[in-house]
């Protein structure tokens, strides 16, 4: 607050300054517009020689009309520049006049919430001669312009302000869920002062606001037809249409499954239901037969390998011989058997020839 007290907010004692000379207020000044119930009272002018005016941010040493420091000629010149509005300006300083600002803001809110107020663009707060700034928020996105004070009143769910009469009807705001956007969009807030008051200054500030006001109402139809459509409803429309399309597709599929073609004779309803049942049973029987045959093939193959292993003398004692070893040993044993058979066949031929020779010798000797 020490740094903020030396900043220029709304009033500058030099009336000939440039338009953009006034510095933008800090975040603390916006708390003064939130209808503070008991704002602090204005400090007395004669509080002390080292006191600093928080509204103007000027040290007592600077030339002020009526102050005890500075040159008298300069103070007279400044008193002429300020004119007769000097005392009223100090009283109307936005940093210290909370009650008057509260009453005016409540009056504007009650006018907007009146039952006869149109739903279109809300009327702007009229410029009052006492220098009360009117806030106007404009969103750079293609949307209708709305007053800055309107979302606050809507967030209160239509609570009555003290200035509202008992007979007036107040719109109750229905809070609707809006999709929160992670993208922050800049919102420009322009504070306009009273054009009749030469001491008021204009200043522009740009802030970043996250668009997740769940209590904001949808724009009126008249504004949406005249201006560009808002991105919010357009972005929500595909989400709403997507489940509708899914539901329609599911309904169509159910209708296709339920609705059958017109029956031709009395066999049509019977032919519809047995087909899926027969197809299912056929699949089950085929699967069962395939599994049975596969198990039988595996059992037969295993039994053949076990029998082959038993026929090979070298593997008869190996109960856990692999199939490759069984095949290789069986091949070697088979080749050995084939060689032995050929050898025995040659010996048999030789023995037969010897037999024939011996029979001829016996016949020759018996002839004598």
Curated annotation (Swiss-Prot):
Organism lineage: Eukaryota, Metazoa, Chordata, Craniata, Vertebrata
Ranges of compositional bias, category Polar residues: 135-147
InterPro entries: bHLH_dom, HLH_DNA-bd_sf, Myc_transcription_factors, Tscrpt_reg_Myc, Tscrpt_reg_Myc_N
Keywords associated with the record: DNA-binding, Nucleus
Superkingdom field: Eukaryota
Chain intervals with Basic and acidic residues compositional bias: 283-294
Listed name of the protein: Protein L-Myc
Acidic residues: bias regions: 247-258
Domain bHLH: residue ranges: 285-337
Region Leucine-zipper, annotated ranges: 337-365
